Amino acid sequence: MTKVGIIICGRYSSCGGGKCLRAVREHKGGFSVYPPGEEIQVVGYSQCGGCPGGNVEYVPEEMIKNGAQAIHLATGLVVGYPPCPRIRSFKEFIEKHYKIPVVVGTHPIPMKYYADHKNMSFWGKSMEQIAPALFSESPETMTEYN
């Protein structure tokens, strides 16, 4: 079993996490990095605290106390508009300070967002490099997450 924490964007602080939890169950999106059949348990779910992400300094510690072995930065940070400009900083800080792996992405990118974002100059390759698991999903899976 792998225990994970999820940090979402502060803009979506009222999000119920339905797509993220579905992706955990289905091993899709960012959770496809874990072996099929391996149980994934969410031991923490919080938001970044809003720009500039003050909770990122403290929230991982609580998740680790609950047994988190990895932290996921939610897909909303990748596909929100504008995408979070601090994703790389959050990932680097958490990995270096807390010595825990960070996966960028939770649920697959919904096709309706991908269709818009893929043509924007600020997105494309830079997001594929930081969140590769999100870009490996089929168009059918992405459409299922609309």
Regions found by a protein language model. Name each.
Residues 1-63, 83-86, 100, 108, ...:
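Conserved mixed alpha/beta catalytic, RNA-binding, or beta-rich assembly cores of soluble enzyme
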Residues 75-79, 106-111:
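Short beta-alpha junction loops
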